[in-house]
């Protein structure tokens, strides 16, 4: 379907659930079928030390980046970030995007065992246990606080291609 309205696909979830991997696979599948879109990794919009969170840098950078995509005719954005499916964050992100976007929110979920396995593949040293603990706490927080209308998608024992295809279907993003 051709649209002039901005559509945003928010993908959130705990560390180790597969947000980035799924985001890149959605990008690959949409590209293969000719669906115009952009992919923005939210963590990269304010990754700095000391953390600039109190200055809303992620939102300011999202406004600037999206303005450039929008000027080139893009109307669909995939946005990945842990907390992107929480109501306050959704409100802040849609305000940063402007244009009253249509939002599809997807909370990726996995078991503690799966998250531990995935995190142990990328985290090294003594920080792994802390990271696993924070991930489990965030999983509970996201599950409790994400709005009911946000889709919950389980990632355990599934291929990335299958998860991405399901999410593309939830967003209704098909080739025009």
Say what each PLM segment does:
Residues 1-6:
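Phosphate-binding P-loop
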Residues 11:
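Hydrophobic anchor at the beta1->P-loop junction of P-loop NTPases
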Residues 16:
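Walker A (P-loop) phosphate-binding loop of P-loop NTPases
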Residues 19:
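Conserved lysine of the Walker
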Residues 23-67:
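Conserved substrate/cofactor phosphate-moiety recognition/catalytic segment
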Residues 57-100:
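Glycine-rich phosphate-binding loop used to anchor ATP phosphates in small-molecule kinases
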Residues 99-120, 153:
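Conserved phosphate-donor/acceptor-positioning beta-strand/loop module used by diverse small-molecule
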Residues 124-166, 173-176:
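Small-molecule kinase domains that catalyze NTP-dependent phosphoryl transfer to phosphate-bearing small molecules
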């Amino acid at each position: 379907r051709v649209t002039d309205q901005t559509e945003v696909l928010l993908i959130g979830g705990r560390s180790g659930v597969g947000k980035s991997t799924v985001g890149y696979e959605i990008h690959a599948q949409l590209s293969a079928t000719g669906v115009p879109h952009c992919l923005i990794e939210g963590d990269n919009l304010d990754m700095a030390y000391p953390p600039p969170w109190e200055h809303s840098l992620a939102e300011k950078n999202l406004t600037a980046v999206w303005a450039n995509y929008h000027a080139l005719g893009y109307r669909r954005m995939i946005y990945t970030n842990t907390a992107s499916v929480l109501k306050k964050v959704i409100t802040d992100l849609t305000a940063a995007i402007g244009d009253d976007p249509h939002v599809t929110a997807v909370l990726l979920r996995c078991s503690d065992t799966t998250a531990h396995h995935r995190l142990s593949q990328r985290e090294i040293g003594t920080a792994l246990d802390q990271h696993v603990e924070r991930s489990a706490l965030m999983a509970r927080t996201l599950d409790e606080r994400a709005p009911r209308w946000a889709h919950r998608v389980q990632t355990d024992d599934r291929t990335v291609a299958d998860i991405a295809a399901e999410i593309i279907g939830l967003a209704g993003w098909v080739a025009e």
